[in-house]
A protein has these predicted regions:
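Short, intrinsically disordered N-terminal pre-domain segments
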Residues: 1-15
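Generic, ordered loop/turn and secondary-structure boundary motif
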Residues: 5, 24, 84-86
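A structural detector for beta-sheet-dominated domains
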Residues: 7, 22-24, 37-39
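Residues that cap or initiate secondary-structure elements
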Residues: 9-10, 27, 42
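Short acidic-hydrophobic surface loop/beta-edge motif
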Residues: 16-29
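Short, surface-exposed, charged amphipathic helix/loop patches that serve as local interaction elements
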Residues: 30-141
């Protein structure tokens, strides 16, 4: 134990359990709800896990395409726990797509989802979103 008091940046329980965050843009367009866990930019173990995932998915280069893929993989496997995506109201055959990290990478790589990926990654790295007062009642789910 250190002789110094250093406050915790996040509630460990909230950071691991995740928080549900809705995404509605400035124009009022709803992009769904996303359950995010805290992605700590200072956690060395998490940084190593990112590198392992990038290597596994073959995106270790510094090409722009690989940067996008690395961001999508990091968020899909380490930050995103679940989602409730909107369905196309004009398509009667539209189905709910359950969350999987593989589908999340595909979704987050879509050129039309760049803003979603960016907004979700920003929130997943924002420690103010993962404080003790943000605990949700998981017994309802």
């Amino acid at each position: 134990m250190s002789k110094f008091y250093i406050p915790k940046r996040v509630s460990k329980q909230v950071a691991e359990a995740g928080v549900w965050v809705d995404y509605v843009d400035d124009a009022g367009i709803e992009y769904g709800s996303y359950k995010l866990r805290y992605m700590d930019p200072f956690n060395q173990k998490e940084q190593l896990e990112k590198k392992r995932l990038w290597s596994k998915h073959g995106c270790n280069n510094k090409k722009e395409e690989d940067f996008t893929k690395r961001a999508a993989i990091s968020l899909a496997y380490l930050g995103l726990l679940d989602w409730k995506l909107p369905q196309d109201p004009s398509d009667e055959k539209s189905k709910v797509v359950p969350f999987t990290p593989v589908d999340a990478v595909e979704y987050l790589m879509d050129e039309h989802a760049q803003h979603i990926r960016g907004e979700r990654a920003t929130i997943a790295g924002d420690n103010s979103q993962f404080q003790a007062d943000e605990v949700e009642d998981t017994s309802k789910n």
